[in-house]
Structures are given as C-alpha cells and as structure tokens.
Amino acid sequence: MRTSQYYLATLKDSPSETEGISHRLMIRSGMIRKLSSGLYAWLPTGFRVLKKIENIIRHEMNKIGAIEILMPIIQPSLIWKNSGRYEEYGLELLKFYDRKKKQFVLAPTHEEVISKIILKEINFNKVFPINFYQIYSKFRDEARPRCGTMRSKEFVMKDSYSFHLNEKSLEKTYHIMQETYKKIFNRLNLDYFVIRAKTGKIGGFISHEFHAYYNKSDVLINSYKKIFDKNNIINKFKKKIEIKNLIEINAEDILLTSDLAKKFNIDIKQIIKILLVHSIEKNHPFIAIAIREDHEIDLQKVENLNQVKKPLKFANYYEINKYFKVKKSYLGPVNIKCLLIVDKEAHCIKNFVSGANINNKYFFNINWDRDVVSYLVYDLKLCRKKYNNKKNNNSIEIGHIFQLGDKYSKPLNYSLLKDYNKKKIFMGCYGIGISRLVSTYIEQNYDSNGIIWNEEIAPFKVAIIPININFSIKVKNFSEEIYYKLCNLKIDVLFYDNVERPGIMFSNIELIGIPHILIISDKNLKNSIIEYKNRITGDKLMINYKYIFDFLLQFNINFNF
C-alpha cells in the first residue's frame, strides 16, 4: 500500500476528551474516529488490526472443529421474555418496534437465538456435541461508555455456543475452549490471567473470566510516563560499558554454572545458557535457545515459534553428544551449528559468559554482533506472577466462558428423543471482546513514540521510508523496486511515497507501530546498504541491500492466515 493511495489519518495531538492511553493512541494513529458517545468508526489502519485479530481467533477456533455461522443482530423480544432475561438486562437492552408494532431488541448476546434456531434443526439431525461461533457486532446501551473501544455501546465480539447430551461432554469442550483462549491471548502476547467468576446475567453454574492488565486511570498513565521519562534521563548519564576482548578459558570439569560463577567471581546474570529444541527442518534438526542463566524459558512462547517442531521437544544427552560433539554445559552461541534464537533480555547483555562448544572450555566477554552475528531475537522469558483469585483493580475482562447447563434449552422446551427417553440438552457459551482486545493490547504495548505492534497483528509489517524521494531518482527507483518485491512476497508493506519531511515520516510510522522499518537514502545506497530499524526492540542495523529480503523473511512476516 502506498501512502499516496491510503488514508493514514494520523494526528499530532489527541482531542481533549480522550480517556486513557489506548484511546489517545487509537485516535492519534488514525485507527478510529468518534461518531457519538460509545460509537466509533474503524478507519483503515484500525480495521486492518481488527481483521488480523479476528483471523487469529478464527484460525484457533477452526483448529478445534468449531463451525462459523452468522446470526442477526435484531432479535424478537419474545425469545428474551421466554428465557427470563428481558427484564434482567434492563436499560442495557435496546428495544424498539417495527412498522407492524412488533417489538425487537438489538442483541448484546445470542444465547436465545442459537437455542431457538440450532436446537430445532438438531432435533432432526442428532449431531452431538457440536460447537458454533460467530464474529459479529453486538450492542449494549452502556450507561457510561468510556476509554474508546475499551467500553463502548457497539463492539465486535466472538461468541460461540456448544451443545451436548451430558455434562461430561460439556466439561470436555469447556476445557478445550479454555485452552484455546489461552492460545489466542498468548499469540497476542497479552499479559493476562484467568479467574473463577460469577455467571451474572448470562447464567449457568460455572464460569471463568480472562483478565488483562491495563492502565486504568489517567493518574496511573501519567505515573507510568514519569517513570519512563526518568529512566530515559538515567540512561543518558550511565557510564558506557567498555566492550572487552573475547577470551577462551579452560574450565575443566566445571559443569555447573554456579561453580563457574563462584570460581571466576562472575555475576550469574552475565552467564548465557543454551537450550536445544527440535526443529521443523529435517536438514537442521535442532534450534538453540539462548537465555540468561537466572531466567527460565516460557514453554508456550517457544512452542509458538514457527521454526519449532510441535509438540515441543528438547534434545536429549545422546542427541547433543552426537550432533554437537560436546557436553550440554559447554554449549554456547559462538559458531553454534544450528539456528540460534535469543531471548530479548539476553540480547541486552554485553561481555557475557557462555560455553565455547568445546568440552571443558568457556568464552568470556562474548558480545552480540561481534562474536555472534547470525541469530533471531524473541521474547521467550517466563514471567512468573502471583495472582489472587480476585479481580485486579487494574485489569479488564477480555474473555468469558460459561457452562450453562439447560438454562436456555429448557425454557424453549427442546429435548431430543434417544433410546425412547427424553434427554436434556446442555449448553456452553464462550465470548471474546475483539474490539476491546485492540485497546487492551495497546495499553500493554506502547512507548513515548506510539504503539508497538507484534508482527501478527500490525496493520503493516514493513514500512519503506525514502529520504528525499522528490530529489533523488536513485532513491525513488530503488524504493519502488523494494516495494514491488515485498508485495510479490505477499508481505503487508506501507510505502511512504508522499513528499514529507523525514521527521514527519518517522513520527507517523512509529506512531502507528509498524514493526520493521526500511530507510532508503542516497548516502546509504552509495555504500550498497539499507538502514533497518526494529520498532519492537529498537535495534538499528545497516544491511547490504542484496540480503534485505532474506533478512526480513527470517521474521516470518509473509506468514498470513
């Protein structure tokens, strides 16, 4: 996509009535615009993000055999009266009459509709258990809409409904759905937790809520800004770390890092350990994971990597000895004979210690990009948090699952004849607030420049910023060539072909949060290089333009659903 053909809609400042960091950034980055209280239009950038989150959810739901359908948002009020929820919902349920004086409601949820339609059909087909889902708009007449799409009147939701002949079958699907929700939120890299919850207006007898942390108030947001600014000031005055020469140390029979640290007086945080997992590549059967010695890897994060074989499996002693010809304790990142993936916190360390891939030897003062040049960086660290079984004051509900029993099937008088005995129909329902997920993600992933999207849900995965495109034919032609090649590789790319000052282009691209940024300039092209910036890590690299596509493809940015 070219910016000259795209509605970027970014703003220098956010309107005064915005509430919370996500609301401000969504307005400023041109994702949404307010129509009325609690009602928002999704502009192109926001709509792209929304659709990518929908596709992740759709992919995970399809994997467990759920079937996608679509139901009307307008529902007869009679079915709500039959279920007993017409009065229970009160003013949140928007009611109206058609020209024939028949009353309808705008749906906040679809339990009544799915029960009426599907159970009547299944009465003849007898297909159990079965799980349906839809991704569609809902409406709730909120008394106090706030924080943009965090709490709005109209919102996009994934709601699903399962039907069963017994409670055991319902419990099994309920567990599968709970694990599926975890996979969805893990793919979004959300910081969330699960709690047992009240069933509320939906009803039923068991329910769990998924909550994500967010900055609940302007006071909290401002305090975060102060901390952020303070850290920036401190970093400016930190003494620059001297890069030391690489040293090979003979440490015979030291197999424990605790012994290594004690003998050489090393801080355990300066030691990098290597873990080996099985790869999907037959010719390259292993992947090395580099992480700080005092950290643990998150198994789910590692298994989610596209390069890793599923289910996750670690290399055993015999495989390590056969393939690498070295004991596990002496494995290290320097010249390792496989793909190397580095945890982002391990990547921040300078002058670290690790194995030399030779028995009884270690390297001291290893540095990334000098001693280790080929690797990928991901967030792989396990974050341990202690959560009370209570709603956290600074969290927001992003998902809710219920075991409903026969609450909806019983009032509608649906049962199934089987073996000449009437059987109850048991239901489960499962919801995810998709438009709320967008806001929640931003609350957890931003900096002073704007939003920080991960590759899967970013509106664009690559941005091309040509410097002085209106003055340099070489910059223009080369930028066009890069753009067409990326498009042919099916990569979402935004080509900033408007004539703007570099500062404005950088500001807009960082504001909307595109993960990979290519900067094309005359100065660099003379040296056959392109400047690359990673929006997620902040890393900057100079890359020979011959290898730019291979470099970008290592991030699997052409992988779409």
Swiss-Prot record:
GO biological process annotation, one example: prolyl-tRNA aminoacylation
Main location: cytoplasm
Keyword Ligase: yes
Pfam family, one: tRNA_edit
Top-level class of the enzyme under EC nomenclature: ligase
SUPFAM superfamilies: Class II aaRS ABD-related, Class II aaRS and biotin synthetases, YbaK/ProRS associated domain
Gene3D superfamilies reported in the protein's UniProt record: Anticodon-binding domain, Bira Bifunctional Protein, Domain 2, YbaK/aminoacyl-tRNA synthetase-associated domain
Subcellular localization, as worded in the UniProt entry: Cytoplasm
Catalytic activity: tRNA(Pro) + L-proline + ATP = L-prolyl-tRNA(Pro) + AMP + diphosphate
UniProt keyword list: Aminoacyl-tRNA synthetase, ATP-binding, Cytoplasm, Ligase, Nucleotide-binding, Protein biosynthesis
EC numbers on record: 6.1.1.15
UniProt xrefs under InterPro entries: aa-tRNA-synt_IIb (IPR002314), aa-tRNA-synth_II (IPR006195), aa-tRNA-synth_II/BPL/LPL (IPR045864), Anticodon-bd (IPR004154), Anticodon-bd_dom_sf (IPR036621), Pro-tRNA-ligase_IIa (IPR002316), Pro-tRNA-synth_IIa_bac-type (IPR004500), Pro-tRNA-Synthase_IIa_type1 (IPR023717)
Recorded GO CC terms: cytosol
One Gene Ontology MF term: proline-tRNA ligase activity
Family: Belongs to the class-II aminoacyl-tRNA synthetase family. ProS type 1 subfamily.
Subunit structure: Homodimer.
Entry's free-text remark on domains: Consists of three domains: the N-terminal catalytic domain, the editing domain and the C-terminal anticodon-binding domain.
Known role: Catalyzes the attachment of proline to tRNA(Pro) in a two-step reaction: proline is first activated by ATP to form Pro-AMP and then transferred to the acceptor end of tRNA(Pro). As ProRS can inadvertently accommodate and process non-cognate amino acids such as alanine and cysteine, to avoid such errors it has two additional distinct editing activities against alanine. One activity is designated as 'pretransfer' editing and involves the tRNA(Pro)-independent hydrolysis of activated Ala-AMP.
Protein name (database record): Proline--tRNA ligase
Gene for this chain: proS
